[in-house]
């Protein structure tokens, strides 16, 4: 799987005594879930490679990596952000080797659009580092009508815990959540 990252570089071109910036797009590997369908209907374009003239001297500089910011989001259906802010409960073992996050959604917006957009396939936690996925998702029903969703995410290593906490920090900053330690 590959993702697109923008790499900018400044190449000095001796043309009319000025510097001309250039940028490119580089494919690099990262952990991103594949998109099953897309509304993009573009067509491939081939551009001729620019050839510097004999009077032009190219002196490439080091490429500079540009980090693209992604708004942290929770999704039950890939591509459809959940608008309801959940109640999140965290537990962690005493030795820190594993932990669990329990997300409780009351009247999630996915119930309004799930028939039109698709089926709930899991809980996807998306931020600039990639996607964290949990498939342990259960709906609560009251009198035959969907009332809420409970999703469980299990972290089996300190590395998974740290990654989840980085996501939650970004998500809570974006949505005004606050960490309250149980007394």
Curated annotation (Swiss-Prot):
**A biological-process GO annotation:** photosynthesis
What keywords is this UniProt entry annotated with?
Chloroplast, Membrane, Photosynthesis, Photosystem II, Plastid, Thylakoid, Transit peptide
Got any disulfides in this one, which pairs? none
Return the transit peptide range from the UniProt record. Answer: 1-49
**One Pfam family named in its UniProt record:** Psb28
The compartments listed are:
Plastid, Chloroplast thylakoid membrane
Q: Which GO terms describe its cellular component?
A: chloroplast thylakoid membrane; photosystem II oxygen evolving complex
Identify the domain of life: Eukaryota
Of which family is this protein a member?
Belongs to the Psb28 family.
PANTHER family in alphabetical order: PHOTOSYSTEM II REACTION CENTER PSB28 PROTEIN, CHLOROPLASTIC, PTHR34963
Q: Any idea what this protein is called?
A: Photosystem II reaction center PSB28 protein, chloroplastic
Protein species of origin: Arabidopsis thaliana
């Amino acid at each position: 799987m590959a993702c697109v990252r923008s790499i900018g570089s400044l190449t000095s071109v001796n043309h009319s005594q000025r510097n001309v910036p250039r940028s490119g797009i580089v494919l690099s590997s990262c952990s991103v879930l594949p998109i099953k369908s897309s509304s993009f209907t573009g067509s491939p374009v081939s551009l001729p490679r620019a050839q510097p003239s004999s009077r032009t001297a190219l002196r490439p500089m080091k490429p500079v990596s540009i980090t693209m910011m992604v708004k942290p989001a929770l999704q039950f259906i890939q591509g459809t952000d959940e608008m309801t802010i959940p109640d999140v409960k965290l537990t962690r073992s005493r030795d820190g080797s594993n932990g669990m996050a329990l997300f409780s959604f009351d009247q999630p917006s996915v119930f309004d659009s799930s028939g039109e957009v698709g089926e709930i396939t899991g809980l996807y936690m998306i931020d600039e580092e990639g996607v964290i996925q949990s498939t342990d998702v259960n709906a609560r029903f009251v009198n035959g009508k969907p009332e809420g969703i409970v999703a469980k995410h299990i972290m089996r290593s300190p590395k998974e815990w740290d990654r989840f906490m980085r996501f939650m920090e970004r998500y809570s900053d974006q949505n005004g959540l606050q960490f309250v330690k149980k007394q």
